[in-house]
C-alpha cells in the first residue's frame, strides 16, 4: 500500500503519517543501558564479569545479564524500539535523496517508544528462556573475539506516527525515504543485514 492517511495539524503545515513496519529480516536489539555506570544492572554485570576464575554457571549468568542489558524494555511498554532510532534510520535514507538536513529539520517520529507487537506481556527474563529469541555471536574486542548475547526478534512489527513539516519537505519524499529505510538501512544492530522492514501506510 502506498497511500498515506495524512492528518493536518491545525495552525501550521505539519502533517502526520501513520505507518506499520513489518520485519523482512530479523531484528537484533542492543540497548545502550550498560553505558550508564550508575545503573544497578550495570553494577551487577560488572560484579559478574570481574570474577577472575569463572565457572560454567558464571558464564551463563554473564550471558543472561548481557542479554537483559541489551533489551529496550520497560513495564509500561514492553519491548520497544526508541523513536530516535527510527528518526536516525529515516535521516540515513533521506541522505540517499540528498535530503538529510531537511529531514533533520522537518521530519520527526511523534512517539518516544515504539512497542514491538505481541511482546507486551513478555519480560526480558522470560524472553531469555526461549532460544529462538537469543542471538549468540562472536564479536571482535581489540585483538580478541568474544561471544555476545543479544535479544533477537525473528518475526516483528511495530507502528509509528511520522510528523512532516511540508514547508521543509514534501510527503512523497518522506514516503520514499520510509520505503528506502526499510529496504536499504534497517533498524537495530548489525543493520542492514538485520532490521530491514516493509512499510504499510495506514
Protein language model annotation of sequence segments:
Residues 1-202:
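RNA-interacting cores
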Amino acid at each position: 500500500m502506498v497511500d498515506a492517511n495524512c492528518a493536518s495539524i491545525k495552525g501550521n503545515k505539519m502533517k502526520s503519517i501513520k505507518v506499520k513496519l513489518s520485519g523482512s529480516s530479523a531484528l537484533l536489539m542492543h540497548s545502550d543501558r550498560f553505558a550508564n555506570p550508575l545503573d544497578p544492572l550495570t553494577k551487577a554485570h560488572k560484579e559478574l564479569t570481574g570474577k577472575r576464575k569463572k565457572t560454567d554457571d558464571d558464564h551463563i549468568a554473564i550471558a543472561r545479564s548481557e542479554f537483559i542489558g541489551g533489551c529496550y524494555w520497560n513495564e509500561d511498554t514492553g519491548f520497544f524500539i526508541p523513536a530516535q532510532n527510527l528518526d536516525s534510520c529515516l535521516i540515513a535514507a533521506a541522505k540517499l535523496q540528498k535530503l538529510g538536513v531537511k529531514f533533520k529539520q522537518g521530519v520527526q517520529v511523534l512517539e518516544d517508544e515504539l512497542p514491538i507487537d505481541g511482546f507486551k506481556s513478555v519480560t526480558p527474563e522470560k524472553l531469555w528462556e526461549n532460544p529462538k529469541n537469543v542471538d549468540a555471536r562472536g564479536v571482535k574486542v581489540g585483538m580478541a573475539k568474544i561471544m555476545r548475547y543479544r535479544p533477537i526478534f525473528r518475526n516483528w512489527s511495530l507502528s509509528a506516527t511520522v510528523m512532516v513539516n511540508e514547508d521543509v519537505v514534501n510527503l512523497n519524499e518522506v514516503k520514499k525515504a520510509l520505503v528506502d529505510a526499510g529496504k536499504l538501512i534497517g533498524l537495530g544492530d548489525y543493520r542492514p543485514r538485520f532490521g530491514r522492514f516493509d512499510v504499510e501506510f495506514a
